[in-house]
Amino acid sequence: MASEHVSAPYDLCIIGGGINGVGIARDAAGRGLRVLVCEQNDLASATSSASSKLIHGGLRYLEHYEFRLVREALSERETLLNIAPHLVQPLRFVLPHEPHLRPAWMIRCGLFLYDHLAKRSDRLPGSQAIKLERDNNYGQALKPQFTKGFIYSDCQVDDSRLVILNAMSASQLGATILTRSRCSEINHDGKLWSVRIEQASGASQVIQAKILVNAAGPWVAQIEDYLHKPEHGNKLRLVKGSHIVVPKFYPGDHAYILQNKDNRIVFATPYRDNFAMIGTTDVDYTGDPAQVAISDEEIDYLLSLINAYFDQPLSRADMVSSWSGVRPLYNDNTGTASAVTRDYVFDLSGGNGQQPVLLSIYGGKITTYRRLAEHALEKLAPFTGKSKGWTSTQRLPGGAIDSPDAYAQQLIQQYGWLSPALALRYAKAYGNLANAFLSANIEEMGTNFGHDLYASEVNWLIEQEWAQTTDDILWRRTRLGLLFDTQQTEQLAHYLDKRPH
């Protein structure tokens, strides 16, 4: 079934349902623009769900003199704490001192800059030097030679839920969000883009748009190739970053930032209560972004570094999960993959009567997505007539809470059957949206597919969050995939198959 013409042209057609695409969609829709997002798979199905899950200034970027990026990221850290208090949580980072890698004075200077580039906040205490004693949480799991260190603040985030809630906000503001929909053909008449969209269901349609935003992430160059823009040349540098997940191997709810002899750093962060996430790597990548996977060399690299710092040795047998993402970085011709800028760059063309406006996006990071979107709309203002930003103060869906801990207590009081752990999961994932699918009695929640994933929550994810498959639900909406066994996953799949579409 094909529909060749859609009523009025969209102001923006955005290719890519990652964090940059949905961030731009939300901002644009809130300015009154008519917006469509086209995502070939699920929202956040590529790079945006495979990050280190941090909202941070990027301490190591100071070594590359990227002061503008760090200042902007630290400012955005504060903004995201305010607009997404359910998703973004303060986290303390412990840096064990390795004097032969970086002298103490250098680290102190870096942390001083980090503290002072940021806005002062009671929620994010400043840095300080600490002793890594065997009788405290910071030093207990480390090898005895690590006696001194530093501690500073940053934040942690559920990256894929950040994408989902931006898409939800965009949709509430009038944007059309199409998932599992591929842009199979793109043409123009000099003034308008014509885009053929083919959906997984077999349906297809042709839409028109005044502006095309290429937010395709690792596929950004492929879109430019299709549009016959060979001048993109070496603008894109794909860098793979991989992570592993293991059972939590240290006490406390802090994270570690570990220095390696290759001058890189690796994080070990608490993940989903009983696990720790270790990453990332930086490896130049030339393959198909859809087929990216962690290599044996990356696994060895991460395990080797952890084992150099911690008493309890880890091996491949400890791994419960891993993932890899491809960062679509702007190629600044830096030698090593780890030194390539994480800043974003726009390529704006058209609007001259010969080609409609095209905006392609390179680089960026989860932390700065909101500012990237705001900046993109500023770039497009001469063509849209909409120049006023609004997203720095408007909370994301579910964000009308003070803190997840406090809201979890409210949920427990309101729904007597809730356990503290489940109430906190709901508070962190949904904030005050949890009320939309919670029932007074546990029986009304429907089937428990395992680990307190009830049919009521599953239905919400399908109806409100574009979820269609078990992977959508278990890995990108709830992160319960770490806990589900094969039988539980099959039971959920059976429910999805039988559910009316």
Model-derived regions: residue spans:
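Short hydrophobic core segments
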Residues: 15, 207-217
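Dinucleotide-binding Rossmann-like beta1-alpha1 core, especially the glycine-rich loop
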Residues: 53-137
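Glycine-rich FAD pyrophosphate-binding loop
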Residues: 29-50
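C-terminal catalytic lobe of FAD-dependent flavoproteins
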Residues: 153, 159-161, 169, 228, ...
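A conserved short coil-to-beta-strand element within the FAD-binding core of flavoproteins
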Residues: 179-193
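Beta1/beta-strand and adjacent pyrophosphate-binding region of the FAD-binding site
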Residues: 6-18
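Core beta-strand elements of the Rossmann-like FAD/NAD(P) dinucleotide-binding domain
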Residues: 8-10, 202-211
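Flavin (primarily FAD) binding-site architecture
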Residues: 214-229
